[in-house]
């Protein structure tokens, strides 16, 4: 509990992209997926735990409101809350819910303001179900105030944005920091929340988390954490700037948001050998940004303290105790979802300067060390595997999930019928993958039906809960495993775009599925419409060594002689975990630099996750992390809320028929977690104990579920029933996490 002012206080896709993809028999989207450091980040430039400008340990030493040393040129934008605003970019709650995206006057040359509006529109809708039946406008949304009351307003928030690059001196860091400060910021009760981008998204990738802070009159500290949607188009050598507009790499210089490290002479040869390729920030920066996600989140908080005081008119000459907003009197909550949630936890673990007071995250990506001694039990039965790093289990799913989704036991799964109709995929591709796995000795069954059942059981045995079974088809259909495995494989290995890791690359394709020139309109707007982890808007995953020439990976013919969705590429990515070649060793080193310690330094913390999560299975994230934290954090204040009938992609609920009748929005619980941590820090209200929250699906026909009500999404409680309690015990160096059925 924090003393405030001297008093004792009493979420990898976008909806429009997916709709367009299905209409065109293509596949595009991913909403969000899985922080750490290499042991050096916490001391990098002295910035990870407080840089000496504004930390709470100076105790009155004369310190001006000096911009942190790592912050470069700052751009300040002001929004009146009428024509434009912080939360909805002037669209209001109704505009965010509209199926019609904001217009762009010149499609091939959008302005920075147009791109910002389009970015906020797409990123909000990617992580939130914006349908009224799903709860938008009643349970959550810009027009629902901080106390949960439905208002008649449109939820627009006036205020200022401060934007900057942090600079480590290399000119290649490729990270953006942004602070939103509402005009209603409560300087008498100051608060900051972090909203590190989810997935591989750009700076507004966690705008739906920022919404909670803006409603609470808090500042919101964002960072893109070294990821983003705007690519380096190698054919034209053009790159995105900080605001998403594009120019040549030469003109951009060090102001580029991302430019692949390369020599012009080598680029020319590369373009001849592999034309029309694209480099992406997360995959191809060669910096393994994930190892510094905690650092970047902490830097965003430091930047926020300076920006708030600057907005309040404080310049120089004040002591720390005279600054109106300072760590000693400000509640700081590290928050976000998915990869951003993992970054928030990384920041809390690395927070040597006590900048962060509490943590509230949803479905965090948590890569855990293999040395943890944690046993997870469900209903009294021990689970065979838990606590694997993200790249491990995603590369495993990349082999088996496509085949597993063909199992007759999950024939009713959302999107499974699309495979049967060959919508965007080759006919019989699932059966071909099953047969190819058998030919490689990875499945023992001899019939397609038995192979699919065997693959599904392998998924369960490797940590996926049975509650995820009905999600495997949509995960496979939207190529989530190959996209995540390819991007993270490149990033962890610090691979150059020139390396074509596992003979995979990114490009637009023509009608014959071969690499083609990028559409000018799509490229100009990609920073706003993409998700940073191809396949994404107009960009596909390419198998460079397909029979007949480079081709879209899912359409390609590989060494099996069939269209098996490039099993060769999947096997190559998987083998990086155990291989001894240079690329494998680079990836293994990079992965070791991203692992979590489990020590939250006694900070009050809430993790919420859906039991059905098929992207980041609970057995590889929140559950074992709860045990690891109990082992290493002697003053642990962590609680874990596991929500039944909830999964990773709220944005799919109104998009894919069947999701609406099966799943409730996890966003409701992410906001409740923030409410609970804030109440704990502000008023001393205890956090709820770890528990399973049992929700009720909306039911009804797929695509026509009845409207959600509060009864569908009960709150967590301070006194959960014995059959709902999640228990953690540590004995003999082993932590046991017991989860009820």
Swiss-Prot record:
Signal peptide residues on this chain, from the entry's feature table: 1-23
Family annotation (Pfam families): 3HBOH
Subcellular location: Secreted
Gene Ontology BP terms: butyrate metabolic process
A single MF term (Gene Ontology): hydroxybutyrate-dimer hydrolase activity
Predominant localisation class: secreted
EC number(s) per entry: 3.1.1.22
Active site: 338 (charge relay system)
Keywords assigned by UniProt, alphabetized: Hydrolase, Secreted, Signal
Region (Disordered): 45-68
Enzyme class: hydrolase
Protein's UniProt name: D-(-)-3-hydroxybutyrate oligomer hydrolase
Biological source species: Ralstonia pickettii (Burkholderia pickettii)
Phylogenetic lineage: Bacteria, Pseudomonadati, Pseudomonadota, Betaproteobacteria, Burkholderiales
């Amino acid at each position: 509990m924090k003393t405030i002012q001297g008093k004792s206080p009493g979420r990898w896709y976008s909806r429009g992209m997916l709709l367009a993809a299905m209409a065109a028999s293509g596949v595009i989207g991913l909403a969000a997926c899985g922080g750490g450091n290499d042991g050096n980040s916490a001391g990098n430039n002295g910035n990870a735990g407080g840089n000496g400008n504004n930390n709470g340990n100076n105790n009155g030493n004369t310190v001006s409101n000096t911009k942190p040393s790592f912050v470069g040129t700052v751009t300040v934008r002001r929004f009146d809350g009428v024509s434009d605003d912080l939360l909805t970019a002037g669209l209001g709650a109704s505009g965010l819910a509209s199926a019609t995206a904001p217009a762009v006057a010149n499609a091939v040359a959008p302005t920075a303001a147009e791109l910002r509006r389009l970015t906020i529109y797409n990123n909000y809708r990617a992580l939130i179900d914006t349908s009224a039946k799903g709860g938008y406008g009643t349970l959550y949304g810009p027009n629902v105030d901080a106390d949960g009351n439905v208002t008649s307003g449109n939820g627009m928030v006036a205020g200022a944005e401060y934007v900057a690059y942090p600079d480590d001196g290399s000119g290649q860091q490729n990270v953006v920091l942004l602070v939103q400060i509402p005009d209603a910021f409560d300087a008498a009760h100051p608060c900051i929340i972090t909203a590190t981008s989810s997935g591989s998204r750009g700076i507004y990738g966690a705008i739906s988390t920022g919404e909670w802070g803006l409603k609470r009159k808090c500042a919101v500290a964002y960072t893109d954490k070294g990821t983003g949607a705007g690519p380096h188009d190698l054919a034209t050598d053009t790159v995105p700037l900080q605001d998403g507009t594009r120019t040549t790499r030469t003109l951009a210089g060090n102001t580029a948001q991302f430019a692949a490290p390369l020599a012009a002479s080598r680029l020319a040869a590369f373009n001849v050998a592999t034309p029309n390729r694209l480099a992406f920030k997360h995959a191809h920066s060669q910096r393994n940004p994930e190892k510094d996600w905690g650092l970047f989140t902490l830097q965003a908080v430091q930047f926020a303290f300076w920006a708030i005081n600057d907005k309040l008119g404080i310049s120089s000459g004040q002591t720390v105790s005279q600054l109106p907003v300072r760590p000693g009197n400000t509640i700081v909550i590290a928050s976000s979802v998915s990869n951003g949630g993992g970054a928030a936890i990384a920041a809390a673990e690395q927070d040597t300067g006590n900048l962060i007071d509490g943590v509230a995250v949803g479905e965090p990506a948590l890569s855990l060390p293999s040395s943890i001694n944690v046993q997870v039990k469900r209903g009294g039965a021990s689970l065979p595997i838990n606590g694997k790093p993200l790249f491990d289990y995603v590369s495993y799913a990349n082999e088996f999930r496509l085949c597993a989704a063909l199992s007759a036991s999950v024939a009713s799964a959302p999107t499974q019928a699309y495979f049967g109709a060959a919508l965007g995929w080759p006919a019989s591709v699932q059966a071909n993958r099953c047969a190819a796995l058998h030919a490689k000795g990875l499945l023992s069954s001899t019939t397609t039906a038995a192979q699919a059942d065997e693959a599904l059981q392998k998924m369960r045995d490797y940590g996926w809960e049975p509650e995820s079974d009905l999600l495997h088809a949509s995960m496979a259909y939207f190529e989530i495993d190959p996209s995540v495995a390819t991007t993270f494989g490149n990033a962890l290995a610090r691979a150059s775009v020139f390396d074509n890791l596992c003979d995979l690359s990114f490009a637009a394709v023509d009608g014959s599925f071969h690499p083609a020139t990028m559409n000018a309109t799509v490229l100009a707007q990609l920073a706003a419409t993409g998700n940073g982890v191809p396949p994404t808007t107009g960009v596909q995953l390419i198998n460079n060594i397909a029979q007949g020439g480079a081709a879209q990976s899912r359409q390609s013919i590989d060494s099996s002689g069939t269209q098996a969705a490039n099993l060769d590429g999947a096997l190559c990515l998987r083998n990086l975990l155990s291989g001894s070649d240079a690329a494998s060793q680079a990836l293994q080193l990079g992965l070791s630099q991203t692992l979590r310690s489990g020590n939250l330094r006694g900070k009050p913390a809430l993790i919420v996750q859906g039991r059905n999560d098929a992207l980041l299975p609970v057995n590889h994230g929140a559950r074992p992390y709860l045990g690891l934290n109990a082992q290493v954090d002697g003053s642990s204040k962590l609680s874990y809320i596991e929500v039944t009938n909830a999964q990773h992609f709220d944005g799919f609920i109104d998009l894919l028929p069947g999701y609406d009748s099966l799943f409730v929005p996890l966003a409701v619980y992410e906001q409740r977690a923030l409410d609970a941590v804030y109440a704990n820090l502000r008023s001393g209200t205890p956090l709820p104990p770890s528990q399973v929250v049992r929700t009720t699906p909306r039911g009804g026909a797929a695509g026509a579920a009845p409207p959600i009500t509060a009864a569908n999404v009960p709150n967590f409680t301070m006194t959960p029933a014995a059959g709902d309690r999640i228990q953690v015990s540590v004995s003999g160096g082993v932590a046991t996490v017991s989860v009820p059925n």
